[in-house]
Regions:
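Structural preference for solvent-exposed beta-strand-turn elements
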Residues: 26-223
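Single conserved hydrophobic/aromatic residue that forms the stacking wall/gate
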Residues: 1-12
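Short acidic-hydrophobic, aromatic-tinged amphipathic segments that line or gate anion-handling sites
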Residues: 14-21
């Protein structure tokens, strides 16, 4: 009915869920929306991240650093979350601010989307890729800490400075309120980094999964 349609206006702006997936509808009814959007603008960068923990691995990533985009895509696909990231950074100065601020906003999105963390697994871990082996232990328990046991032989992979990998995860830990232990070894630096990001994504996938109804802590809260 065209007249009714005009009266309702733009329905898409009002609805909280738009999907033809029964699986996603079921998850939404049980857990509610776990989708957030955060924008952060400084004199150095402008970062916008949209994260849906109840997603299906869809992503659109544009940071200005091709290899970094490739790594962030691994997070979306292997964690099974929908992720949109748009970054305008001062790359003419350095890659540091772009990588750091992306990690900060991504971590904030996870912290906000998880909310009280009711019903989640909380913990996650994972592993390998070709010659490289990576292990990531993750706890979304609210305590921030990073243990980094990764040796990278090359200074750059593509347009990405490898020293920023550790800084990315350190920044994510702080804003995402999580504990990360990452270790990896191998011959090819590209493979090592990709194994780390994929293992991280698989750990995230396990940790954010909702399997119960209570807070996964004897304290009764996670903060």
């Amino acid at each position: 009915d065209p007249e009714m349609s005009r009266g309702l206006g733009d329905v898409y702006k009002r609805q909280v869920l738009h999907t033809d997936s029964w699986r996603e509808i079921t998850r939404f009814i049980i857990s509610g929306s776990r989708k957030v959007r955060i924008c952060r603008k400084t004199a150095e960068t402008e970062v916008t991240v949209t994260l849906n923990l109840n997603g299906e691995g869809c992503c659109s990533i544009k940071t200005g650093l091709s290899f970094f985009d490739h790594m962030l895509e691994q997070i979306a696909r292997h964690a099974g979350v929908d992720l949109e990231i748009g970054v305008r950074g001062d790359l003419k100065v350095d890659e540091h601010h772009t990588v750091e601020d992306t990690a900060i906003v991504l971590g904030e999105c996870f912290a906000k989307a998880l909310g009280s963390k009711k019903g989640i697994e909380r913990y996650g871990f994972a592993l390998p890729m070709d010659d490289a082996k990576a292990e990531v232990l993750l706890d979304f328990g609210g305590r921030t800490w990073l243990e980094w046991g990764v040796t990278l032989k090359r200074e750059y992979v593509g347009d990405f400075p490898t020293e920023m990998a550790r800084h990315f995860f350190a920044s994510f830990c702080q804003s995402g309120q999580c504990n990360l232990h990452i270790s990896a070894q191998g011959e090819n630096t590209h493979h090592i980094l990709e194994a780390v990001f994929k293992a991280f994504a698989r750990a995230v996938r396990q940790a954010i999964r909702q399997t119960g109804g209570g807070i996964p802590s004897s304290k009764g809260c996670l903060a």
